[in-house]
Amino acid sequence: MKRVGILTSGGDCQGLNAAIRGVAKGLYTEFGKDVEIYGIRDGYKGLIFGEYKLMKPEDFSGILTLGGTLLGTSRQPFKTIRVIDENSVDKVKNMKDNYKKMKLDCLVILGGNGTQKTANLLREEGLNVIHLPKTIDNDIWGTDVTFGFHSAVEIATNVIDCIHTTATSHGRVFIVEVMGHKVGWLTLSAGIAGGADVILLPEIPYDIDKVAKCLNDRIKAGKKFSILAVAEGAISKEEAALTKKERKKARENFPTPPSCTASPRSWPARWTTRSASACPATSSGAAAPAPTTGCCAPAWGPPPPGSSKRRNSASWWAWWAASASPSPWVTWPASSRACP
């Protein structure tokens, strides 16, 4: 009698139930009644606390196209897997003990790169482990495509594609944030398929000046809208030179961009140049000074009541940012990130 355990760990995605069904069908086809499959609940959590049940063939029926995972899932960070918690639970020891308690010949684990690290740890502890690469990020070493990736690309592509109509109708710049903390496969694939005008990836630090130039070039070419596909882990060239802690601190200190209803079609009239020495004249006729090279003051209207009259004051530049651009994050030059 062969005994096989199966669990899913980490975030859910399309294809989990299909993969579970495939494993079960393959085992039943190969061994028939001489195999027992144990479904382990909620990922590694179930293996740690002994939450599992003996599955039957009918349990795997009708789940081929069902989203999520019938086994449940949870996140168990690899960096804490060997840490004894406040309840004196030795997670690694418990997993080994429950593996032996079920008398498993093999443990099949479905998950991403964090799950893979823990699976490898269990292998090093003497357990027979098979890891099936599941992640929408497509960042598992040793495989071309992970299951869950293609479905995520399709969904992200549809979002980018559908937003074109609104962007065109209102003449706006849209930023579509796509999942991908350290890798940009999903953003790249969806951006290309969905027709994004700018794609920013974690692997390639971006130059905000080039991004702004690209958007302005589209405006000059008569394009009323632009769509940016941005991976959640995308960073600028300036941020890339910082440590992780420095980057986090810099982002915490960076001002939140104010909201605005200005459209890109008004940019050329409002922001004719990005040179500090060639800013358009203010209402008083004098060129407004910029706090740093690359910033440019607007040429219309006085600051709102209550704000400082000094054009190098924080309140004045906050007003300028709100008036000049619907997205200061995009249009502010990299050299001007110190703008208050």
Regions found by a protein language model. Name each.
Residues N98, I109-G111, K117-L121, F149-H170, ...:
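Accessory alpha-helical/coil subdomains and C-terminal extensions
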Residues E30-G32, E36, L122-T146, L200-D207:
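Short, acidic/small-residue loops that bind anionic groups at enzyme active sites
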Residues G142-V153, A287-G294:
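Short beta-strand elements at the ligand-binding edges of bilobed clamshell
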Residues L7-T8, G39-R41, G72, I109-G111, ...:
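Short beta-strand segments
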Residues M1-T8, A19-D105, G114, S236-A241, ...:
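A cross-family phosphate/adenosyl-ligand binding-site feature
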Residues R21-E30, L54-D59, L121-H131, F147-S151, ...:
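A glycine- and small-aliphatic-rich helix-loop capping segment at beta-alpha/alpha-beta transitions
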Residues C13-V23, L47-I48, V92-K93, L104-N120, ...:
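Short glycine/serine/threonine-rich phosphate/pyrophosphate-binding segments
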